[in-house]
């Protein structure tokens, strides 16, 4: 395209079988057959491939219009997909083209990023449509201006989305923003399109011979300001190439010079000849600066600039000569000139299609269950599992531990085993040995401690990474604060800006310290009972050798009855534990088999308006009634917990009463061998109790560290996003400081150049009255010379 304006090249994307990708997602995650959506899947594959095949257009407006409709149609499809699928369901690949040649492919597993890329394509396409319009007619200029504004609106839409994303601290998309979507790049493109839209208005104005110079000057200065903003953002972007930077710089200075050229004409018409010279000097200086940046700039742009420069130079020489010889007006400096106030005739227009909902009769995947329903079902399933754990597993485990401790505190069953089985291994010890071997014994605990150490190492690494991010921001902020000075570097320090994050990291450190102390206590407990566990794990023979025999004691009839009653109570305790184990197994099966998803689907299909607003947003709270109704499934089981607790309390009371009788009856019959055997048996019972505690401690420790990793990873992501936002903030602040300094420097240089280098004598000169050239002043004498 042979033009003095810029168009934005389209990104490139490889062909993707999007339909097949979505088919796999439906098959793996939805309770609906993918074959039901074959036509939709084929359609979306064809549409995505059409998008990938769109090329940069030339002057074929019909082809451009068709490409426009394809992109807008695909955008509507993406809006539907966002309601039906998770954001990370498919991976897309794009090539950036803003810099020197295609770069990539850059891969993104995000429907949001795909949507932004499509909007970027639409903005690029609108810029090309605008340039393809004729600039020799008012209609062509009007259409070009409209498309440039639409293009600017596309990039404004992208930038607004990025701003909201960065504000949202919990959005993981912050770290996935493509380089071509960074704020400086997008804003450069937006203001470039606005500048070119304003330029078409300016061109239409100069084509009108009756247009006032003041209006043209204001249009020119506003065009220059738009190019100036585009240039500022372009300088801070990594993708805007030198050709574009120089183009925008030349355009900025060109329209600055054009504005002052028009202002000089206005000054001359008002007999302000000093101001006329000053405006022309500013214009001359502007074109001189522009010519210094002409490298790589389009020849048409340079021709326009050179033509303007020639006019300015001629008028400046004439105006200076007339003022020096005739008018003798003092030439003011640039800062003393009346400011030219720009008038903007353009704005960023977001295409209406971006906000439109797809028509119900053309919407694809209409019968596909929205992914949020799956998400809600998963969340409620997790709540259900947590409910079962909290209301059933934890209470029953606590009751069992209380029962074991209750018996061990009363030396049961070791006290009666030492009497009734003076030589044989008690059944309870054999049972404990089998349970320990089934669990894995010492090897299992050793392995569990090693796994715990790995988790702990990962947790410490997470903590270190969080601290590193904060320390990195602190060092960067301190360095820039020293470089720029605290007067100009006005943003918050790291300790203030990251106050909440620092609190979270400190809390993480405290949790890990407490957990480490707890691990040490559990490890000591393990070493205390390790000898007993080795005996338990060594088999029947080792137990026989470890447990000493005792002498046979003939028991009185009354004591035998008491022991028999105790045995009966202990058997009931074992039965109680077995019943609880069977109850939990049955409960797990029932919980697994009763999924809440079918109920959610039924409720959603029966009354969609209740669960989904007109804007397509879901009312998650409305599903709560479905969950509450579903959880009534466990009402009867709650009653079982109360019953088994009451049964245990009754049994413990009965055992305690009988055991007191046993202790009183047995005191007179106990001998040293019997006492020694009872102590060993009691040690083994205590070791088994501590073994169960250690297993429970290790399980809790593993859960703690796993949860810590999950939550710590979220904190680390917050630190990453915080560091990213702070770096963007630093770059913007540095740019603002740099621009302010450059503006001050330019003003100073201009003032030095515009100062009048003439020395007048101390004689007072009477300034002649001003008059337009060619008019005779009747007060002057007639002279012939």
Curated annotation (Swiss-Prot):
**CDD domains linked:** BRO1_ScRim20-like, V_Alix_like
Q: Which GO terms describe its biological process?
A: cellular response to lithium ion; cellular response to neutral pH; cellular response to pH; filamentous growth; filamentous growth of a population of unicellular organisms; filamentous growth of a population of unicellular organisms in response to pH; positive regulation of filamentous growth of a population of unicellular organisms; symbiont entry into host
Give the region (Disordered) as residue ranges. Answer: 748-785
Instruction: Write down any Gene Ontology CC term.
Output: endosome
Start and end of every BRO1 domain? 4-403
Task: Spell out the SMART domains in the cross-references.
Answer: BRO1
Report biased composition (Polar residues) as residue ranges: 754-770
Give the family from UniProt: Belongs to the palA/RIM20 family.
Role summary: Required for the proteolytic cleavage of the transcription factor RIM101 in response to alkaline ambient pH. May act as a scaffold protein that recruits the calpain-like protease RIM13 via SNF7 to its substrate RIM101. Required for filamentation.
Cross-referenced PANTHER family, in alphabetical order?
Answer: PCD6 INTERACTING PROTEIN-RELATED, PROGRAMMED CELL DEATH 6-INTERACTING PROTEIN
Give the record's subunit note.
Interacts with RIM101 by binding to its two YPX[LI] motifs.
Specify the protein name: pH-response regulator protein palA/RIM20
Origin organism of this chain? Candida albicans (strain SC5314 / ATCC MYA-2876)
């Amino acid at each position: 395209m042979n033009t003095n304006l810029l168009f934005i090249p389209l990104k490139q994307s490889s062909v993707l079988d999007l339909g097949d990708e979505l088919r796999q997602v439906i098959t793996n995650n939805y309770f609906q057959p993918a074959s039901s959506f074959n036509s939709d899947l084929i359609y979306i594959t064809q549409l995505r491939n059409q998008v990938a095949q769109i090329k940069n257009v030339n002057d074929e407006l019909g082809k451009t219009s068709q490409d426009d409709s394809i992109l807008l149609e695909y955008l509507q499809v993406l809006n539907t997909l966002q309601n039906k699928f998770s954001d990370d369901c498919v991976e897309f690949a794009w090539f950036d083209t803003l810099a020197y040649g295609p770069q990539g492919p850059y891969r993104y597993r995000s429907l949001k990023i795909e949507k932004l890329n499509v909007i970027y394509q639409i903005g690029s396409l609108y810029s090309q449509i605008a340039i393809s319009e004729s600039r020799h007619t008012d209609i062509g200029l009007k259409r070009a201006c409209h498309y440039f504004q639409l293009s600017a609106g596309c990039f404004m839409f992208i930038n607004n989305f990025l701003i909201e994303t960065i504000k949202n601290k919990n959005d993981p998309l912050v770290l996935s923003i493509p380089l071509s979507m960074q704020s400086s790049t997008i804003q450069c493109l937006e203001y470039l399109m606005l500048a070119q839209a304003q330029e078409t208005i300016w061109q239409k104005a100069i084509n009108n011979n009756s247009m006032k110079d003041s209006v043209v000057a204001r249009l020119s200065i506003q065009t220059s300001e738009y190019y100036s903003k585009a240039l500022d953002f372009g300088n801070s972007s990594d993708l805007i190439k030198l050709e574009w930077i120089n183009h925008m710089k030349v355009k900025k200075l060109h329209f600055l010079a054009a504005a002052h050229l028009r202002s000089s004409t206005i000054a001359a018409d008002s007999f302000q000849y000093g101001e006329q010279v000053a405006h022309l000097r500013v214009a001359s200086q502007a074109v001189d600066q522009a010519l210094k940046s002409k490298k790589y700039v389009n020849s048409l742009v340079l021709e326009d600039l050179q033509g303007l420069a020639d006019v300015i130079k001629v008028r400046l020489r004439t105006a200076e000569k007339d003022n020096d010889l005739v008018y003798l007006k003092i030439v003011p400096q640039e800062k003393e000139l009346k400011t030219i106030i720009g008038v903007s005739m353009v704005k960023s227009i977001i295409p209406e299609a971006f906000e439109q909902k797809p028509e119900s009769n053309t919407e694809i995947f209409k019968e596909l269950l929205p992914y949020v329903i799956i998400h809600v079902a998963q969340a409620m399933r997790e709540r259900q599992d947590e409910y079962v754990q909290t209301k059933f597993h934890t209470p029953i485990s606590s009751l069992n531990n209380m029962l074991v401790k209750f018996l061990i505190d009363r030396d049961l069953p070791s006290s009666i085993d030492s009497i009734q089985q003076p030589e044989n291994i008690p059944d309870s010890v054999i049972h404990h040995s089998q349970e320990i071997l089934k669990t894995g014994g010492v090897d299992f605990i050793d392995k569990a401690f090693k796994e715990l150490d790995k988790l702990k190492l990962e947790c410490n690494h997470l903590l270190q990474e969080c601290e590193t991010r904060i320390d990195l921001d602190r060092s960067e902020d301190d360095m820039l604060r020293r470089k720029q000075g605290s007067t100009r570097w006005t943003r918050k320090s790291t300790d203030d800006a990251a106050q909440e994050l620092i609190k979270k990291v400190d809390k993480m450190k405290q949790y890990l310290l407490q957990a480490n102390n707890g691990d040490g206590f559990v490890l000591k407990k393990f070493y205390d009972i390790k000898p007993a566990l080795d005996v338990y794990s060594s088999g029947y023979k080792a137990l026989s050798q470890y447990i000493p025999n005792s002498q046979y004691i003939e028991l009185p009839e009354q004591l035998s009855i008491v022991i028999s009653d105790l045995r009966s109570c202990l058997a009931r305790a074992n039965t109680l534990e077995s019943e609880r184990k069977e109850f939990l197994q049955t409960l797990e099966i029932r919980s697994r088999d009763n999924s809440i998803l079918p109920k959610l689907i039924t409720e959603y299909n029966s009354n969609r308006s209740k669960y989904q607003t007109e804007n397509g947003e879901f009312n998650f709270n409305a599903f709560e009634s479905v969950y509450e109704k579903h959880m009534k499934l466990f009402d009867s089981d709650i009653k079982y917990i109360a019953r088994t607790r009451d049964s245990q309390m009754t049994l413990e009371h009965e055992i305690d009463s009988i055991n007191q009788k046993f202790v009183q009856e047995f005191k007179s019959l106990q001998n040293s061998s019997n006492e020694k055997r009872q102590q060993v048996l009691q040690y083994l019972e205590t070791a088994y109790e501590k073994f169960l505690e250690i297993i429970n401690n290790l399980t809790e420790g593993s859960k703690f560290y796993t949860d810590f990793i999950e939550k710590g990873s979220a904190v680390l992501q917050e630190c990453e996003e915080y560091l990213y936002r702070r770096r963007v903030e630093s770059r913007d602040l540095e740019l603002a400081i740099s621009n302010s300094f450059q503006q001050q420097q330019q003003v100073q240089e201009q003032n030095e150049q515009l100062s009048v280098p003439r020395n007048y004598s101390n004689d007072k000169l009477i300034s002649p009255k001003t008059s337009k050239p060619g008019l005779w002043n009747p007060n002057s004498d007639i002279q012939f010379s």
